Amino acid sequence: MLCYDKRVETLVIRDLGRLDYREAWGVQLETHAAVAAGDAPPTLLLVEHPPAITFGKKGGRSNLLANEDFLASQGFSLYDIERGGDVTYHGPGQLVGYPILPIGRKVRNYLRNLEAVMVNVLAEYGLKSEGSPGYAGVWVGDEKVVAIGVAIKRNVSFHGFAMNVHTDLEHFTYIVPCGLADKSVTSLSKLTGQRVSLEEVKPKLVRAFRDVFGVQDVQHIEDEKKQEVLL
């Protein structure tokens, strides 16, 4: 199931480890410019962020439930960014992926493919999950386990997905996640009843990404920016 016409010969997996949101954002923009110019192959950035709250194009401070000074005192950073969607949280224990791919104008197909990747990963843990019509992301029952929010510029994608692996779910109480007051969030560890590490999930994610997007060759790069990942 491909989201663009030309089959990907090579996908670079660049693991940034644990990295500040602003710095990772800069890496995204640099990589996006290179891919869009044809100077770099399609790339999937993997990263874990310190606590951060981001507001997409539909995001508003009305969905922020905690005082900004309080959040700053707790080590949270806040960012207004160019992805679609509303407000979301990033933090330790969450596996974030930024696929930077030439998708053309097939945005809807691309989003469905991202959902399919996540569904395949969760299935390896015996979990039945699905996308929900009208709501971006992947759900197990009525609980969201993966948030998805993307941006497209020059027909190349950036931003992406955030899978709650062993995330501190209390941090989501500081926001109305994705602006959906009647929905809740969960994590892979909570759903399975055991602590799952990011390092365990990563190869499953890469395999699912390869299968869904029809990638021919995967190249892994250990990034010089990479810091120790929280397990």
Predicted segments, located by residue:
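A short secondary-structure junction signal
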Residues: K58, N109, V150, T173-I175
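Short, acidic Gly/Pro/Ser/Thr-rich loop/turn segments
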Residues: I53-T54, N155, E170-H171
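N-terminal lobe of the biotin/lipoate ligase/transferase fold
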Residues: L2-V145, R195-V196, K225-L231
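Short, conserved beta-strand/beta-arch hydrophobic-aromatic motifs that form part
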Residues: R61-N67, I148-V165
